[in-house]
Each structure stands twice: as structure tokens, then as C-alpha cells.
């Protein structure tokens, strides 16, 4: 074989090799999708079964009801767990709290937190360094309604492999389906992420939550999410917070929580002013503006900002045991601080209010 023929054979051989570059290697690494850690996280079925068993073990403190709704052939169920000692739910002197978790299917860690809070309320688990006498005094004053998994149909889509799904079982974002500023679209609107539905409250899940909020008339509402670390108050559809005494009390509470439990790591302020985009048709804005709940919040309990955009399980949920435990412990403690000081804030004497402000001066917003 002459040298010219050998040269062309070598060129053809090189052309047949797979093309490789450092850019491709980086892309391959970024395309890795983290699966659900089944050793850490309950399935939706197992989590609800564990909650039901917890309720049955403590009938003097807990009860559970399942509320159903349907719209145009689409059905949804929402389980609501109520904590109230001696089951005196009609006691108007008690501080009423409504907490909802799992509104977005991909945020599994939020429902794990719901289970942890219920376990502490039932006194099967305890927070580190918790004073049990102080806990008893606090719990005597409360009625807490917990929705552990608001969007169970969307959660099942995540468990079936669509790890980035945040919408409900027919593709609507439940946190864009409420009526305050509903349907408005920003320039960066993503229909996959933010589909608001055909009309306000078109979705059974939103209908159930609205009915629950209006009938229960809570003093305090928290919508629990993940994706970042934040303690947000209204508004989501504006880049400002409300005026007045109620707003001042909400600011005092989030500053206290941020200082006490998170060393100032959490973003605070309005959702619309802190996140970098406005959100329209959200639950918390309706709860504050229309339902007139005096203290309404959206908490974001975890986020991995280094995760690639398609690696949603890692982005929204802790993937290792140490971080998982830390998130549940820190946020459980934060909620029990709310349970303790929330009633004081709403019925606060001036001397107590100044003491709270002295204990926790305003912290700078963490951006």
C-alpha cells in the first residue's frame, strides 16, 4: 500500500471517531438527572398512610378529613389534618393556623416537613432542646389545620418520572389559579411552568383550599414551598409589602425567624420584590387581600442553586441525609416559634411588642 493510500485511510478513521470536547464533557455532567432518593423520601401513598396512622394513635388531638371536588371530569382530593387538644375546635379564643404543603408536585421535602410537624404536635417526636412545659402551654392555645399534600395528582406525576412537574394532574399551576391579579403574564411567562388555568379557581384543588380558608378563618396562613430559602409575605403580584400594623407584625415575625433559626440566610420581604419576578394569581395574595387573614406568608424551605435547570429533584429537595435532617429540624423549630409568638403578635401589649423588637432587631434582607 503506498503512503498516499495510508494517509487517506487514517483520515477516514479519524472522521469515524466520536467527536469529543471539554464542552461536551461539561454538558454530559450537567445533563445528569438525580432520581428521587427513596431511602429518604416517602411515596405519596406511604406518607399519607403514616399520617393517617398518626391520627388514629392520637384521637384526642388529631383528626383527618378528605375533601373532594371535581371540574369538567377532573377530580381531586385534599386531606386536611386538624390539631386541637380535646377536640374543642369551636373555641374562638384559640389561635387558628392553616398550613399547606406540596402545592407543587416536585417539592417533596415540603410534605416531609408536614409529617414532622404533625409528629411533634402529637408529641411522638420532640425538637432538640425543647422545653416540654413551654410546649404544652403553647399547644393549649392552638388549632392547627395542616394540608400535607395539596397537589397529590401532580405529586403522582413526579413519582412516575416527570421530576420537574409543578402543576396539577391536568397541567395547571395551582399557585397561579387564585383570583388576585389572575391571568396576567409577565414578559418571561412560561406556559409550562405557570399555566393559570381557564379561569380563577378552575381547579378543584384551589376550590377546596379557598373553601377551607374562608370557613376556618385562620389568624395565620403559611404556604410552604422549596426552591430557595425565603420567608416571604405579601405581595407576590407587586414589588411592595402592604402598609399598616398587620404588615409591621409580619415583618417582625419573619425577621425574628430569620435571625433566630437561619442566621440571616433567608430572603425576606415581599415575594414580588425579592424573587426578581412578579407572580399573579397566587394563594397567599388572595388569603391576605380577599380572605383578610391578618398574617399570610409563603416560606421557601430549601433550594440547591448549583443544580442544573433540568435536575429538578436535586434543585428542590435535599439529596443527602444530613441536609434532609437539618432542613426538617430547622424549619420545624421555626414553625414552633410561630406557634409560640404568633398569638402574642396579634394580641400584643405595647410592652411585649417592644421586648420582641429588642430581642430581634430588623435584619438586613438577604438577596
Placement of each model-derived feature along the sequence:
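Bacterial N-terminal signal peptides that target proteins for export
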Residues: 1-9
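N-terminal signal peptide
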Residues: 2, 13-35
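Soluble metallo-hydrolase cores and metallopeptidase-like ectodomains found primarily
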Residues: 43-95
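Solvent-exposed, polar/charged alpha-helical surfaces in well-ordered, non-transmembrane soluble domains
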Residues: 45, 49-52, 115, 119, ...
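Structured segments of extracytoplasmic/periplasmic soluble domains
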Residues: 50-57, 117-124, 149, 212-216, ...
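Active-site/substrate-binding loop(s) of hydrolase catalytic cores
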Residues: 93-103, 107-248, 300, 307-316
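Active-site-adjacent substrate-binding region
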Residues: 207, 211-221, 227-229, 251-278, ...
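Active-site-adjacent mobile loop/cap segments within catalytic or ligand-binding domains
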Residues: 221, 229-245, 281-359
Amino acid at each position: 500500500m503506498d503512503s498516499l493510500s495510508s494517509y487517506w485511510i487514517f483520515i477516514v478513521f479519524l472522521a469515524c471517531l466520536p467527536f469529543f470536547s471539554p464542552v461536551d464533557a461539561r454538558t454530559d455532567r450537567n445533563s445528569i438527572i438525580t432520581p428521587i432518593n427513596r431511602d429518604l423520601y416517602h411515596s405519596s401513598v406511604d406518607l399519607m398512610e403514616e399520617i393517617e396512622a398518626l391520627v388514629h394513635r392520637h384521637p384526642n388531638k388529631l383528626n383527618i378529613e378528605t375533601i373532594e371536588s371535581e371540574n369538567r371530569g377532573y377530580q381531586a382530593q385534599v386531606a386536611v389534618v386538624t390539631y386541637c387538644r380535646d377536640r374543642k375546635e369551636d373555641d374562638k379564643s384559640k389561635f387558628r393556623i392553616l398550613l399547606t404543603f406540596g402545592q407543587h408536585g416536585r417539592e417533596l421535602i415540603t410534605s416531609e416537613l408536614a409529617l414532622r410537624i404533625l409528629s411533634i404536635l402529637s408529641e411522638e417526636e420532640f425538637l432538640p432542646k425543647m422545653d416540654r412545659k413551654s410546649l404544652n402551654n403553647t399547644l393549649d392555645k392552638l388549632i392547627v389545620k395542616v394540608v400535607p399534600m395539596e397537589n397529590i395528582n401532580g405529586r403522582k406525576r413526579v413519582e412516575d418520572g416527570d421530576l420537574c412537574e409543578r402543576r396539577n394532574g391536568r397541567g395547571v399551576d395551582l399557585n397561579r389559579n387564585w383570583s388576585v391579579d389572575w391571568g396576567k403574564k409577565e414578559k418571561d411567562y412560561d406556559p409550562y411552568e405557570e399555566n393559570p388555568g381557564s379561569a380563577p379557581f378552575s381547579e378543584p384543588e384551589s376550590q377546596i383550599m379557598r373553601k377551607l380558608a374562608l370557613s376556618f378563618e385562620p389568624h395565620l396562613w403559611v404556604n410552604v414551598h422549596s426552591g430557595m430559602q425565603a420567608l416571604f409575605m405579601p405581595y407576590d403580584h407587586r414589588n411592595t409589602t402592604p402598609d399598616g400594623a398587620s404588615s409591621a407584625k409580619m415583618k417582625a415575625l419573619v425577621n425574628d425567624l430569620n435571625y433566630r433559626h437561619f442566621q440571616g440566610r433567608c430572603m425576606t420581604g415581599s415575594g414580588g420584590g425579592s424573587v426578581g419576578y412578579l407572580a399573579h394569581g397566587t394563594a397567599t395574595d388572595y388569603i391576605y387581600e380577599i380572605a383578610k387573614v391578618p398574617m399570610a406568608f409563603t416560606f421557601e424551605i430549601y433550594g440547591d442553586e448549583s443544580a442544573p435547570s433540568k435536575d429538578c429533584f436535586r434543585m428542590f429537595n435535599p439529596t443527602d441525609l444530613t441536609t434532609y435532617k437539618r432542613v426538617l429540624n430547622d424549619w420545624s423549630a421555626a414553625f414552633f416559634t410561630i406557634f409560640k409568638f404568633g398569638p402574642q403578635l396579634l394580641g400584643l401589649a405595647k410592652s411585649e411588642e417592644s421586648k420582641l423588637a429588642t430581642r430581634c432587631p430588623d435584619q438586613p434582607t438577604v438577596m
